[in-house]
């Protein structure tokens, strides 16, 4: 019995110690290294291209755009129309580098009242922009009762152009 175990161990050790057969090489997976396709693949590995899908997704835009939002007299609540929402959404995406919000009035009230109206209008636009997903760190607010008149006309149609909030969108 002992000899049978010894012989079985010797046979199994001899079988394990033989080297494996070398693989056969057929050559069917060979790729010529100097072919134009191989050179192009190597060039793309070394210098990958930027994805072009985003370039076609968002058309080129000017570095600075301004949108004017007009308000009725002494109204500070921002209730955008669907046209205003569409225009602003088009300009806000992708999120611009910075947005300046300037509240302005028509100088109809004494300066302290006009300053408050301009400030609250600018804050209304600021809050709307934040609710639309624009980071607060990218928005600057300013307001002034007497500044940057669009119209110096003393009559109501000219004054309407002065009751506004300018939204200046900076891309660069």
Curated annotation (Swiss-Prot):
Keywords: Cell outer membrane, Lipoprotein, Membrane, Palmitate, Signal, Virulence. Pfam families: OmpA. Residues 1-15 form the signal peptide. GO terms for cellular component: cell outer membrane. Residues 58-172 form the OmpA-like domain. It is a lipid-anchor. A lipid is attached at residue 16 (N-palmitoyl cysteine). It is found in: Cell outer membrane. A lipid is attached at residue 16 (S-diacylglycerol cysteine). The virB operon is essential for intracellular survival and is not involved in the invasion process. Constitutes a major determinant of virulence in mice. This protein is essential for pathogenesis in mice but is not required for intracellular survival. Transcription is turned on at the beginning of the stationary phase of vegetative growth. This is Type IV secretion system putative outer membrane lipoprotein BAB2_0057. The lineage of its organism: Bacteria, Pseudomonadati, Pseudomonadota, Alphaproteobacteria, Hyphomicrobiales.
